[in-house]
Amino acid sequence: MARSYAERANTHQSPVARRLFALMEQKQSNLCASVDVRTTKELLELLDKLGPFICLAKTHIDIIDDFTYDGTILPLLELSKKHKFLIFEDRKFADIGNTVKHQYQGGVYKIAQWADITNAHGVIGSGIVKGLKEAATETTDQPRGLLMLAELSSKGSIAHGKYTEETVEIAKSDKEFVIGFIAQNSMGGQDEGFDWIIMTPGVGLDDTGDALGQQYRTVSQVFSTGTDIIIVGRGLFGKGRDPLKEGERYRKAGWEAYQNILR
């Protein structure tokens, strides 16, 4: 039996997850906007439009050509407060613990200072979780959360089978910091006391794929296999699309699909 976001907001071990579930319930949204744009202006304008409809904004901050901390991150944080969404930097860390620790807290982007959530590959082993958690606790007193990449939506992905199983085992190493997975299906864990959040990319109401190997599934399909949050990018703001209309369209579709699995 599926549990409501409100119930999970009251019981989750992670303060980040509790806050996220509470926002989802309040805004009646399980929509994460994937804003892969190249300029600060585009990023901020898009999120100002999409903000009312989303619970989470997913960034690739290293593709912003004119990035500055004060000019990009500070206004982004203001928008997240204005519209009440969390920020997920899709960094996909994949190195030894000591290296990812520096990548997360330092450099130009200083991700641990501002991103509520980030993610990592499991290929390195559990040391990556330890390194990232150390960086988070040393950098800020604000709670942070980590998603592990268990399954991907791209054609030919090798993230399945044994790889996925081992990634789930890594996630078990830290119940508070690891809040869930990027995945296409539920990763279980309930019997062992885990309440993992499943965020699913490759969701489209109109498209089935692209020329670079992305494969799309419908909103109802991904909720039937265990998702909690749908990640949508070009469906919200691609060529000829109005972010205001599409934001509400995807928000409504995601919420209705969630309501259906509760029945």
From Swiss-Prot:
Source superkingdom: Eukaryota
The protein's Enzyme Commission number: 4.1.1.23
Gene Ontology BP terms: 'de novo' pyrimidine nucleobase biosynthetic process; 'de novo' UMP biosynthetic process
Leader peptide range in chain numbering: none
Catalytic activity: orotidine 5'-phosphate + H(+) = UMP + CO2
Active-site annotation: 92 (proton donor)
Family: Belongs to the OMP decarboxylase family.
Protein's name in the database: Orotidine 5'-phosphate decarboxylase
Lineage of the species this protein comes from: Eukaryota, Fungi, Dikarya, Ascomycota, Saccharomycotina
